[in-house]
A protein has these predicted regions:
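Beta/alpha (TIM)-barrel catalytic core signal, keyed to glycine-rich beta->alpha loops juxtaposed to Asp/Glu
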Residues: 1-125
Length: 125
């Protein structure tokens, strides 16, 4: 969700050096898992730091993720990680899990179409 610094400055450097990036907050501190929604209170140690994503842009991204996840029969987390993997400058997105269920969600592999990637990119700008 914090794409501008990477895409406007760092991605070109990474690619010119022939290396790749490892995004640390691949699920935007859990926001892209879909558990944070308007009007929903979430008990989490990350809840306060996730507030920065709870904006019109953030809700648009979740809406796009919802649509794509439904089409693939997949979790929002797996779609969000697939979105990161679609970026040529990213080798491996990093995501953490606290439960077995969360681990199962992030282990799903979702390959997105160009149209789906474009939809997510448009929502996040």
């Amino acid at each position: 969700m914090e794409r501008k610094p990477f895409e406007t400055e760092q991605a070109n450097v990474v690619q010119s050096l022939g290396i790749s990036a490892l995004p640390f907050y691949g699920l935007a501190r859990g926001f892209l898992s879909g558990k944070y929604r308007p009007g929903v209170s979430v008990e989490s140690v990350r809840a306060e730091s996730v507030k920065e994503y709870q904006t019109d842009k953030g809700w648009k991204v979740l809406e796009a993720l919802d649509h794509i996840a439904k089409a693939h029969g997949a979790s929002l987390s797996s779609v969000a990680l697939g979105w990161l993997r679609s970026n040529a400058a990213v080798s491996t997105p990093i995501a953490s899990a606290r439960t077995v269920e969360q681990l199962k969600e992030i282990m799903q592999v979702v390959v997105l179409t160009q149209e789906e990637v474009a939809s997510l990119n448009a929502a996040s700008l």
